[in-house]
Amino acid sequence: MKKLLFTFLVSTGTIFFSCQRTYTQSKDYKNASLTIEERVDALLPKMSLEEKVAQMRIFHANIGVEAEGNGNLKLSDKVIEKLKLGIAGIKNPGEHMDPVAAAKFNNDLQKYIIENNRWGIPALFVTESYNGVDAAGSTRFGRPLTSAASFNPQLVNRIWDVVGREARLRGMHMCHSPEADLVRDPRFGRMSEAFGEDTYLTTQMVVNAINGVQGNYDGLGNGTHIGAVAKHFAGYGQVLGGSNFAAIEISPRTLIDEIYPPFEAAVKEAKTLGIMASHGDINGVASHGNPELLTGVLRDQWGFKGYVVSDSNDIARLFYFMNVAESPEEAAQMGLEAGIDIDLYAEDSYAYLPEMVKKNPNLEKLIDRSVRRVLRTKFILGLFDNPYIDIEEVKKGVRANSSLTLAKESDLESIILLKNENKILPLNKNKTTKIALLGPLVKDDTKSMFETVASKHISFVAEKGFHLTDEKGGAPKLLERDENAISKMVNMAKNSDLSILFLGGDEFTSKEAFFNNALGDRATIEPVGAQDELIEKIKALGKPVIVVLKHRRTLAINTISEQADAILDTWDLSEFGDESTARIIFGEVSPSGKLPVTVPRSIGQIPFHYSMKEINYKKGYLFMEDGPLYPFGYGLSYSNFEYSDIKKSNSEMTKDSEIEVSVTIKNTGNVKAKEVVQMYIKDVKGSVIRPDKELKGFEKISLNPGESKKVSFKITPEMLKFTGLKMEKVLESGEYTVMIGTSSVDYKKTSFQLKK
């Protein structure tokens, strides 16, 4: 066997030198003056079948892409073997290194890859982004659900612009983000990775995230930004029971009207370079084996030209988990025929393709189709012409002062004021006050961050008290109630003028439930541990209690809502989160965030989102107050805003015309503040049962005390279309109600008639 292997290598070497001579004569695909398609056409026919299949696989750097003590590249035998034929990409190389070291490391890695495959094909280095580049030394922003609360798409664009720049500077080329999923079930552990429950809000945020990370597409070839991979197509956030990998049962109409639009906009408007398929199925059809979805909808209907990548091991799972393939080989064929171009991580899926082609030569046409998409991406990114990073640029560009300032700005626009009894907030920083910072979400630097904001008149004591879980990564367990910790915090509160409690959840109470030996979803949505008990005991002291919520999933905070004098919902902010929270608490900035989700009173209300069909709202439940605890779009301010004078440009609209609806907003308070003006539309009578209302526009404005501003929204026929009885998009005549206001339940309204 060893002798045969040696013979094969020798013969391969012979082919190598032969092809090198041909390449020296032509150098066609290296010619930067050719179009990208011409370069792909020149390169693809030169490649062997095995080399093509290598361009359809991504492996993780943790299988043996390392640095020695001196920083030099160290590759395992397994990795060396994989790279002989080239590779589509590598996930997270150098992720634990500082940016400069990572850039040097990735330059060395790319050089090795280029010099050790026949055609000098560079690799895609792939990262992710949930709160900045998923790597050491990067600027840490709030998570997507946090930034969605800003209702400021331009801010999201700027955040992701930094992500794109910082990622490219460390040698990355693609980002398996953003999530274009809707998240409507707070049991789901990955809730904070997406932009909320609403189709329109998510679409605006996704388009701006992609435009930002890709540098408005121009940054790809310029070498300043990276390609986006919108995920998870489609319906992933709708898993039954909020359980990762669970089945997805969703009507075709809901899929088309609510789930698809963020992905469609990612393709058509933002020109995302990549799409990642969903872990799950849609009504029994596995997404990774669904040509109607990945080819019919994505490519034939929307015109997507980029590549589709599997989620981790999901082609193989068609065989061993979903049981829709008879063998690993059949799973590979299903993925290929469906339109999966790159196999992520799996060792036993597309590796079968060369042998399968011997039995079914027609498969090579599909392989060529996928490889063409991968090569095109590499040419778009300029990797054949400029594959390396300028180290001097890294030193200047990562964690720039402007990026750190942006992280703080995004925090301030995203914090939501849920309650402010008797206007206890903002606190007077010039009044002598002793404040206790208490609770399981207090961090080591919380006290120091508050001290940087407060004046010398304010003194702080801080105590975490107890942890929520044992903080084990796979399946964390809740800790037993700690009476001593609770008593200590109550005594500290007793000896203070007021308490700020840091409650909610952390990364161990809401996270991705990886496939093996890991949990992250929940069956309940109340705050875990003794948090409710803590606030009740401190409230009983008769002193003011302010709650700062930190969390990654929506929580049913009934007790907290009842007991607290004020609540600031901060979700999961940037690395400067506690400093930003202090700035809000002491009135440097008025809070302007709005809820990107509906907050239920109980898990029994789920599914529960503001845009559900109107018939869902006709009845409540026994023994529980009806409606949400806090509605979508809700958020208070330190000021007050008066809405008046709602007007429309016309009472009638046709399929060929538009109308404009406006409202005047006045800041009637005494502080400068921002307000999110929201427009909802309701189809009063439809051929199918329609949503109660749908967000169709919003604008964030800033007003000085006493200042007024007129805000206008354009309503187009396209905004009113939906999937009708025949499963085709329709525009129906009739009455439409327009609601403009401060939340999904507080608004002024008018109406118009659509006439055919």
Curated annotation (Swiss-Prot):
Upregulation: By ulvan and rhamnose.
Enzyme class, spelled out: hydrolase
Gene3D superfamilies, per database record: Glycoside hydrolase family 3 C-terminal domain, Glycoside hydrolase, family 3, N-terminal domain, Immunoglobulins
PROSITE patterns linked: PROKAR_LIPOPROTEIN
GO cellular component: cell outer membrane
Molecular-function GO term, any one: alpha-L-arabinofuranosidase activity
EC number: 3.2.1.-
Lipidation (S-diacylglycerol cysteine): 19
Entries under InterPro entries matching the protein: BXL, Fn3-like, Glyco_hydro_3_C, Glyco_hydro_3_C_sf, Glyco_hydro_3_N, Glyco_hydro_3_N_sf, Glycoside_hydrolase_SF, Ig-like_fold
Any one GO BP annotation for this protein: xylan catabolic process
Signal peptide as annotated in the record: 1-18
Domain of life: Bacteria
SUPFAM superfamilies: (Trans)glycosidases, Beta-D-glucan exohydrolase, C-terminal domain
N-palmitoyl cysteine: lipidated positions: 19
Keywords: Cell outer membrane, Glycosidase, Hydrolase, Lipoprotein, Membrane, Palmitate, Signal
Matches recorded under SMART domains: Fn3_like (SM01217)
Main location: membrane
Entry membrane topology: Lipid-anchor
Location(s), subcellular: Cell outer membrane
Entry function: Glycoside hydrolase probably involved in ulvan degradation. Ulvan is the main polysaccharide component of the Ulvales (green seaweed) cell wall. It is composed of disaccharide building blocks comprising 3-sulfated rhamnose (Rha3S) linked to D-glucuronic acid (GlcA), L-iduronic acid (IduA), or D-xylose (Xyl).
Family classification: Belongs to the glycosyl hydrolase 3 family.
The protein, known as: Putative beta-xylosidase
Organism field: Formosa agariphila (strain DSM 15362 / KCTC 12365 / LMG 23005 / KMM 3901 / M-2Alg 35-1)
